[in-house]
Amino acid sequence: MADEEKVTTEEQALADEWAAALAEAGDASQDDIDALMAQGGATPVAEPSTPRAPMEEFGASPKAPTISGLEGPNLDVILDIPVTISMEVGHTDISIRNLLQLNQGSVIELDRLAGEPLDVLVNGTLIAHGEVVVVNEKFGIRLTDVISPSERIKKLR
């Protein structure tokens, strides 16, 4: 019985809220308010008045604006972007104490043996290995092993 009183009280409160809202709107008559109270505040849900768009209007292929003359990606745009290429002979970790003690003539031992190939890095990403050569009295590098594009992409992830 307590549950019935609770439901009735909730329905009455909902009906009172609707009546107050309709009274504020000013276009509600007393008959409308009485009808809402008689229904217990339950009002039928009205269907939306706007019709739904048929699914065939939303085709599977999007119709993006096209620029004339560009069928695929234009890779020429990125071919002139400068990149930094560097060769790494080797590396090592030292403490700041040892770093501060370095001076002219100090020797730093690296992790690679003499004659081992160098790492060729483009913007910090390893792309190849090579050996040092001299070209017109300048250092150069002869590539001995180039990493495949798929392996380079894997390293980026």
Curated annotation (Swiss-Prot):
GO cellular component: a single term: bacterial-type flagellum basal body
Location within or outside the cell: Cell inner membrane; Bacterial flagellum basal body
SUPFAM superfamilies: Surface presentation of antigens (SPOA)
Residue span of region Disordered: 24-67
GO MF annotation terms: cytoskeletal motor activity
Membrane topology summary: Peripheral membrane protein
InterPro entries given in the database record: FliN, FliN-like_C, FliN/MopA/SpaO, FliN_T3SS_HrcQb, SpoA-like_sf
Function: FliN is one of three proteins (FliG, FliN, FliM) that form the rotor-mounted switch complex (C ring), located at the base of the basal body. This complex interacts with the CheY and CheZ chemotaxis proteins, in addition to contacting components of the motor that determine the direction of flagellar rotation.
Homology family: Belongs to the FliN/MopA/SpaO family.
Protein's recorded name: Flagellar motor switch protein FliN
Record lineage: Bacteria, Pseudomonadati, Pseudomonadota, Gammaproteobacteria, Pseudomonadales
